Amino acid sequence: MSASNVSLLHETSRQVAAGGSAGLVEICLMHPLDVVKTRFQVQRSVTDPQSYRTVRGSFQMIFRTEGLFGFYKGIIPPILAETPKRAVKFSTFELYKKFLGYMSLSPGLTFLIAGLGSGLTEAVVVNPFEVVKVGLQVNRNLFKEQPSTFAYARQIIKKEGLGFQGLNKGLTATLGRHGIFNMVYFGFYHNVKNIIPSSKDPTLEFLRKFGIGFVSGTMGSVFNIPFDVAKSRIQGPQPVPGEIKYRSCFKTMEMIYREEGILALYKGLVPKVMRLGPGGGVMLLVYEYTYAWLQENW
């Protein structure tokens, strides 16, 4: 193996390790908000006495009826997926950015397109895990009464298969969700980070990067949430058992808009921003500091 190939493999290994670490930390800290967000998105009416109206009320209801572990339903699939997912997220962003560097594009546009490409690639990897995660998150039974992650995955495969009606349903919505989020997330972060001067003070530099990452995650959440709502409806339980109402991404968006209004496409925005705002800052910081440490020590 040539020296250049060894160097590339070493660099990719650092990106995998740093990306996996960033994803694991973000998931463990922010997963309860992801559960609340999904519950908001799959409900179709607030007249149900078991409906979720506010973030605080949702936390209280889940804790009262499902216990503390109710906030961690569906956490195994994202944990299992985080290392490959974040490895794909960060390594493909760097790969696409390097490839686009050979073209006559402005740096700002390069960051946006590389982010879009990384999001689309990431979506293909993560979608089966998302199908399992959403199904577990919307289950209102006590944690000990619901099927295990692997049992539920086998159940989906047995009943619906591996295709676009089974373990890969909602792929188009997932492509939209991740593509748009990463385009805004990476595009805004790298463009603004290069504009705002860095600080020699470690604390101020930490706050600078966290602040930019926070805004990046918030903006990405606002722009991609209609795709997120459509994804939850397609991958979650259908209104009538045995009858598939939500099939394709854009038809699902149109149906939600027609039946529930434009604001329904933004259900779960508050818990999503509460998760991916600070989560976006945490993830980029963990990645950058872990990657810098690995460059010095490995």
From Swiss-Prot:
Gene Ontology molecular function, alphabetical: alpha-ketoglutarate transmembrane transporter activity; antiporter activity
What are the subcellular locations of this protein? Mitochondrion inner membrane
Q: Which domain of life is it from?
A: Eukaryota
Pfam families tied to this protein: Mito_carr
Q: Which UniProt keywords apply?
A: Antiport, Lipid transport, Membrane, Mitochondrion, Mitochondrion inner membrane, Repeat, Transmembrane, Transmembrane helix, Transport
Membrane-crossing segments per the record: 16-36, 69-88, 112-132, 166-186, 204-224, 276-296
Q: Which Gene3D superfamilies match?
A: Mitochondrial carrier domain
| Task performed by this protein | Transports dicarboxylates across the inner membranes of mitochondria by a counter-exchange mechanism. Can transport 2-oxoadipate (2-oxohexanedioate), 2-oxoglutarate, adipate (hexanedioate), glutarate, and to a lesser extent, pimelate (heptanedioate), 2-oxopimelate (2-oxoheptanedioate), 2-aminoadipate (2-aminohexanedioate), oxaloacetate, and citrate.
Indicate what this protein is called per its UniProt record.
Mitochondrial 2-oxodicarboxylate carrier
User: What gene is this protein a product of?
Assistant: Slc25a21
